[in-house]
Amino acid sequence: MNSILDRNVRSSETTLIKPESEFDNWLSDENDGASHINVNKDSSSVLSASSSTWFEPLENIISSASSSSIGSPIEDQFISSNNEESALFPTDQFFSNPSSYSHSPEVSSSIKREEDDNALSLADFEPASLQLMPNMINTDNNDDSTPLKNEIELNDSFIKTNLDAKETKKRAPRKRLTPFQKQAHNKIEKRYRININTKIARLQQIIPWVASEQTAFEVGDSVKKQDEDGAETAATTPLPSAAATSTKLNKSMILEKAVDYILYLQNNERLYEMEVQRLKSEIDTLKQDQK
């Protein structure tokens, strides 16, 4: 029994303890298998990267390429160039992955800093005319329509002030005249009215069929004297009942009679011209008969 146990122990020790040459061979076989597996992984990763769609994020491509332990020099150069570009341009990851727009504090802070820098640069290059009018300067770079709105508001306010000034001028209370000024104003108006009335009364005296009639308005002293002289002559000569009971003439009636008289004179002038032409033709015929 003891001999059997000794044999089993020896056989197990022989199986566990291997020679050094066999151990080296086994280690080389393991390394070859691992390298073969890594090469297969690299080839599969390259194929998957080449077959990926155009919108695949750049992070996945870089991570798949960097996960391989053994690769070709071209792949290493490609990976290093991608790493350099990602270091120089960190916003590529931002644009490649739209879901990271709201979860990237670094990018948002950089954008805010750029906007602040742009605002400062625009403020430095503003002309003096805009600096004198702060209401027309746009503080928000995104809203381009506010300067136009401010300009329109300024124009509207200017127009409103002008209209208000005109209304106040029109609505200004009229100055009240003193009693002396009122009396002088009334005298001037009366004199102006009497001058017009006297001219119309003289026109009435020219018209033969209304010259002897009385007027219904006030006239000057010169016309009154002539009316008195005409009244004395009319008293000596009796007038018919129709003329005695006739109403006084107003200004419109006198002007109407004046127009009728002018037309009457024009017609008479044409008739006289025709008569003159007829007489001239008769004289010419008589001279020819005498010859």
UniProtKB/Swiss-Prot annotation:
Gene3D superfamilies: Helix-loop-helix DNA-binding domain. Induction: Expression is induced in response to adenylic nucleotide reduction. Keywords: Activator, DNA-binding, Nucleus, Phosphoprotein, Transcription, Transcription regulation. One of its GO terms (cellular component) is chromatin. The keyword DNA-binding applies. Coiled coil: none annotated. InterPro entries: bHLH_dom (IPR011598), HLH_DNA-bd_sf (IPR036638), Regulatory_TF_Diverse (IPR052099). Changing V210I: In SGC1-2/3/4; suppresses transcriptional defect caused by a GCR1 null mutation. It is found in: Nucleus. This is Transcription factor TYE7. The lineage of its organism: Eukaryota, Fungi, Dikarya, Ascomycota, Saccharomycotina.
